Amino acid sequence: MVDPARARKLAKRIGTIVATAIDHEIKDPRLAFVTITDTKVTADLHDATVYYTVMGADLESEPDLVSAAAGLEKAKGVLRSKVGAGTGVRFTPTLTFVADTVPDTARHMEELLARARAADDEVARVAAGASPAGDPDPYKEPRVEDADDAEVDEPSRSRQAD
């Protein structure tokens, strides 16, 4: 087991090395739109999981996740060599590449929130013109003082004064 702070620093360093190598040194066109988003290292520093996203060539095109995964698997040996040279640890961690689902999840959540906002706006629009059915408050009646009640109270007050 190693200090968690050291593991975090190593994970950050591995992510930087892999991202730099993909951008500048590996000439595989399948990796042109790959972005490294996060890196996790196990407590024994023997395994590193590198999370990545793939963007489309333009806004309308879908990203090619399959070819990007194949390109990363092919470049895994070169990337591990770069990590070993760049980190200086005794044992170079094995690299595992995992497609990051956070952007897709965030996009899905935004769609759900937009639908909820639209439903709230529709309810507010319908409620704006609505009026309650029946009386404003059918359960309460205003209290009305009867003349009979006033006469009954007068003698009782006079007895207390005596």
From Swiss-Prot:
A biological process from GO: maturation of SSU-rRNA
GO CC, any one term: cytosol
Entry annotated with the keyword Nucleotide-binding: no
Primary location group: cytoplasm
Similarity field: Belongs to the RbfA family.
Protein's job: One of several proteins that assist in the late maturation steps of the functional core of the 30S ribosomal subunit. Associates with free 30S ribosomal subunits (but not with 30S subunits that are part of 70S ribosomes or polysomes). Required for efficient processing of 16S rRNA. May interact with the 5'-terminal helix region of 16S rRNA.
The protein, known as: Ribosome-binding factor A
Name of the gene this protein is made from: rbfA
